[in-house]
Amino acid sequence: MTITQMISEILMHNTVYNYILSLISIILFIVIGKYANALIERLADKLHKKSGIELDELLIRALSLPVAIAIILSGFYFGVNFLYLLPSLKTAVNEGILTAFILCVVVFFDRFLNELVERYLALTISKKTKKDVDDQIVVLTKKLVRLVVWVVGLLLILSNLGYDIKTLLAGLGIGGLAVALASQNLVSNLIAGLIILTDKPFKIGNWITFSGGSGIVEDIGIRSTKIRATDNSIIVVPNSKLIDEIIQNVPSKNKWKVSTTIGVTYNTPVEKIRKAEEIIKNILLEHPNVEDEPITVYFKEFGDWSLNIQVVYYIKNSRYNGYQKYISTINEVNLKIKEEFDRKGIEFAFPTYTLYLKRDD
């Protein structure tokens, strides 16, 4: 075998000129795709500023990425066709490129419909009902739309790969009973999720207590509900089980109650007890995470080894990182009380006992 023949075998019977044309085609279309993406984004911005028509803007923005990828895929398609490939390899490459084109279309509909739901569903219903749409309804609708789009996309891809969709659907019909039995839990969880959304025993951001624990509801999904527990862990509860629970719900828990007792020594004079109450109240009033009202600080009782000052206050809650905010606020308040008491010479009490020893002479 001559050197020329060896090189020809290595290059799969393509000339260097063929490879250069293929590479130029791919690079050229990558550059065009990049600029097309930027151009479409600028067009969307300009359209929004001029007309303020959000639907057109959504459509164009949703097109930007899929169009850019489609242009780049076109470059690969033309690049491959500049080369001589084995028929089976060429067919496989072309099928792969066509599959990627279908994915671009799926991504477009996924982006466009989800943005449409995000922007217009809440606005449309709120105009009719004069109230905001619950966040979880929008989230659930987006998930369902995404599921439908990707299922249709998967069927198109399978059809492109040579599978008979009618046969597949018929097979699903024959095995429908088995699928129904296997998906019984999924269906029951889906129905339970819809019951939670419509009946509204709780909403995202509510604090609930049930047999499995307690915490803030972070997400109500198709299959399960996610609850942020007090130790910052996530409890995932199937919806079908949750609706059978006895749930204690504080729907307006926008604050956390803190009740604590601070003991000072028995030799603390009355003036310093009053000063201690004043210090604690000022610290709570000045902290940004503490509700201004109600704050309760009072001399509660004469304890076994301390004069007890009762402190009750409320920490503002937030939908996200609520528990972290709760513990960090308590930490900051307690450190500040310790610092101020030390500075004013107010002593904390600790368990002490006085022993009287009687000596028999």
UniProtKB/Swiss-Prot annotation:
Q: Could you confirm whether the keyword Transmembrane appears in this record?
A: yes
Q: Which Gene3D superfamilies match?
A: 1.10.287.1260, 2.30.30.60, 3.30.70.100
What is this entry's stated membrane topology? Multi-pass membrane protein
Question: Which organism was this protein described from?
Answer: Methanocaldococcus jannaschii (strain ATCC 43067 / DSM 2661 / JAL-1 / JCM 10045 / NBRC 100440)
Keyword annotations for this protein? Cell membrane, Ion channel, Ion transport, Membrane, Transmembrane, Transmembrane helix, Transport
- Where it mainly occurs, coarsely classed, is membrane
Q: Name one GO cellular component term.
A: plasma membrane
Annotated function: Large-conductance mechanosensitive channel that opens in response to stretch forces in the membrane lipid bilayer. Selective for cations. Rectifies with voltage.
Keyword Cell membrane belongs to the record: yes
- Provide the leader sequence positions: none
The biological processes this protein is annotated with in GO are:
monoatomic ion transmembrane transport
UniProt superkingdom: Archaea
Subcellular location(s) per record: Cell membrane
Q: Which family does it belong to?
A: Belongs to the MscS (TC 1.A.23) family.
- The protein, known as: Large-conductance mechanosensitive channel MscMJLR
Q: Which residues cross the membrane?
A: 20-40, 65-85, 89-109, 137-157, 177-197
